[in-house]
């Protein structure tokens, strides 16, 4: 499933609904793939959906959930593998994408240590991070990164890899870390065998390596021809090395496979020459790389610089620009969203692009489709926006077939058949039929989603089945569902039926802002729903509010004020609210109003959250901060007062550091609740 529209055109509630749907699908596929070696879908389908989820969560960080598959650094801890607590956390790296960002990194290093430094520059191998522990020279444990603190014991699988030494050349007790990967030749051989066996092929070498290494059957791993590069030792004192470069050389002498391409660079000009050299040789290397890693060479300076809760301060990853690939458009599909917007998506021949197989790309709207002049049968060039979202760059006109058909822009809704319109000069094509089946289903899906009424266990699949059986049509119908009706859903036995009935019943008690969000009012997302609930307190008050009163609220403009007044004063809304009242849905705001917030540390401050949290989910921490008077935003700017950074924070942390914004880790942030 490609995203139905551009990220910047989405409302947060729409993004949340899409993301939750993707999480449920990916969780099921991932378990089948990793624990049973029995994938339900081809890898490129998994990759597409995973890329969509990553893009949504990066654009709308407030929708990230602690259990999201994207928040597991190395995935879930699988049943059948023993959990391993790392002696030192296996931290992630910060990413940069330009020379200017490398200059900023170098400036920070020089400012902190007081002088220029040498860098050891290494290729960023596209594989799976591993840890190896040796006692008296004997391999006693190998593990995956896992969530960074706890990984999986895969010692038996790692022992099947030829480049992992069972015994070192010296009887040392050390822990080293590196990357397990599948060489390109091995990947081609594996996929050829998969095809011969009638099994789906792997989308890319990294996925193949990860799936092969995390097998419950070690014989499967042994046949997959994996390899390793070791690049760090946890305690460099055990080797007596003074520099990163020297440590890698010493690890090679111990019997580890290390990458010979590392170089010591005295300045950024030399670093950039290294980048240019290997970016040009990227396709010729026998293994996959997606960038280079820049590390302060002096190990004592690494210790001095230290790390944040999530990333070392002494290293950075430079990611290569997105690749382009050519493919052929075979169809253009039109889908209908919750608000009636009809979106075109190009369906293409599958093609490898930046490490994944791509077969779909959204064209967002008719104007973009016509501006890019995309026709069925065209050869197009693709790239990945942000290395995540597949996007058509342009049509290769010289390859356009003679007599190609003209663009077929729909004039009627593909779901209900009613005529499509452009409202108020909108670019989007829109179906304005309130009884359009696709819109009804999408509205119901949104109503039950995590950021709206949060009815756990009620996903798109269940909504679609309930609608198809004519059990639900309006929001209040959800609260009239019976156990007999729910038992007709696929996979619903007594326990699952009871759990869903309980979740539906619990949603009646939600605070008003969730209901407002669930109603799907144009221009109203999670944040605006809370503003309305805090300001007006009850649904009855909202129903009686005029355009002028809405417009008087600081964060509400004239257009939104008109939308709100039109909606709440309509007969449709009145009937909808009356029906929801009749089934016992709460109509009052239950949270703390801003005026009632304590005069504490966060009162009146603009706060941004980033990275993975341990003690709170993102939404829980956001709710707590709001109750303390904070204004929680989604992006870092000069107006940001505080950045709360969990594990694996990325560009927001880098930007906050550059702007001199106060940065707190989760523990520090929680400690200030009482200040």
UniProtKB/Swiss-Prot annotation:
GO terms for molecular function: DNA binding; DNA ligase (NAD+) activity; metal ion binding. Residues 597-675 form the BRCT domain. PANTHER family: CHROMOSOME TRANSMISSION FIDELITY FACTOR 18, DNA LIGASE. NAD(+) binds at residues 43-47, 92-93, 122, 145, 179, 295, 319. It catalyses: NAD(+) + (deoxyribonucleotide)n-3'-hydroxyl + 5'-phospho-(deoxyribonucleotide)m = (deoxyribonucleotide)n+m + AMP + beta-nicotinamide D-nucleotide. It comes from Pediococcus pentosaceus (strain ATCC 25745 / CCUG 21536 / LMG 10740 / 183-1w). Belongs to the NAD-dependent DNA ligase family. LigA subfamily. InterPro entries: BRCT_dom, BRCT_dom_sf, DisA/LigA_HHH, DNA_ligase, DNA_ligase_AS, DNA_ligase_CS, DNAligase_adenylation, DNAligase_N. One of its GO terms (cellular component) is cytosol. DNA ligase that catalyzes the formation of phosphodiester linkages between 5'-phosphoryl and 3'-hydroxyl groups in double-stranded DNA using NAD as a coenzyme and as the energy source for the reaction. It is essential for DNA replication and repair of damaged DNA. GO terms for biological process: DNA repair; DNA replication. The keyword Transferase does not apply. Its cofactor is Mg(2+); Mn(2+). It holds the Pfam family HHH_5. Zn(2+) binds at residues 413, 416, 431, 436. The active site is at residue 124. PROSITE patterns: BRCT, DNA_LIGASE_N1, DNA_LIGASE_N2. It is an enzyme of class 6 (ligase). This is DNA ligase. Its EC number is 6.5.1.2. Keywords: DNA damage, DNA repair, DNA replication, Ligase, Magnesium, Manganese, Metal-binding, NAD, Zinc. It comes from the Bacteria.
